From Swiss-Prot:
Belongs to the pneumovirus non-structural protein 2 family. The lineage of its organism: Viruses, Riboviria, Orthornavirae, Negarnaviricota, Haploviricotina. The DNLP motif has IFN suppressive functions like binding to host MAP1B. This is Non-structural protein 2. It comes from Human respiratory syncytial virus B (strain B1). A motif (DLNP) lies at residues 121-124. Keywords: Host mitochondrion, Host-virus interaction, Inhibition of host innate immune response by virus, Inhibition of host interferon signaling pathway by virus, Inhibition of host IRF3 by virus, Inhibition of host IRF7 by virus, Inhibition of host RIG-I by virus, Inhibition of host RLR pathway by virus, Inhibition of host STAT2 by virus, Inhibition of host TBK1 by virus, Inhibition of host TLR pathway by virus, Interferon antiviral system evasion, Modulation of host cell apoptosis by virus, Viral immunoevasion. Monomer (instable). Homomultimer. Heteromultimer with NS1. Interacts with host RIGI (via N-terminus); this interaction prevents host signaling pathway involved in interferon production. Interacts with host MAP1B/microtubule-associated protein 1B.
Length: 124
């Protein structure tokens, strides 16, 4: 009996210790669902049509990301996720290249827990 209690206690400790990682994996998964080829295409279209500079393009990217996140998870979880993103610096940030005055988003910068993601690696 004592062995079972020790195992249960150990499992509880492991679950408690891994909470930040599980939240990070949820956010990473949501980010991969939100930021798709279509999402990047829309950002690139905005950059071309409105002739945005890098600051404006980054702002447009983040606003669109947050709106999709809010729509996907609802207001209660949205607040929790954005607080986590702010605290741990896990907001996805775009990588832009300049094509003669027009910006193109080619991917997402790496964060503390995620590698660099290029638009060709994203979901369609």
């Amino acid at each position: 009996m004592s062995t079972t209690n020790d195992n249960t206690t150990m499992q509880r400790l492991m679950i408690t210790d891994m909470r930040p990682l599980s939240m990070d994996s949820i956010i990473t998964s949501l980010t991969k669902e939100i930021i798709t080829h279509k999402f990047i295409y829309l950002i690139n279209n905005e950059c071309i049509v409105r002739k945005l500079d890098e600051r404006q393009a980054t702002f447009t990217f983040l606003v669109n990301y947050e709106m999709k996140l809010l729509h996907k998870v609802g207001s209660t979880k949205y607040k929790k996720y954005t607080e986590y993103n702010t605290k741990y610096g896990t907001f996805p940030m775009p990588i832009f290249i300049n094509h003669g005055g027009f910006l193109e988003c080619i991917g997402i910068k790496p964060t503390k827990h995620t590698p660099i993601i290029y638009k060709y690696d994203l979901n369609p």
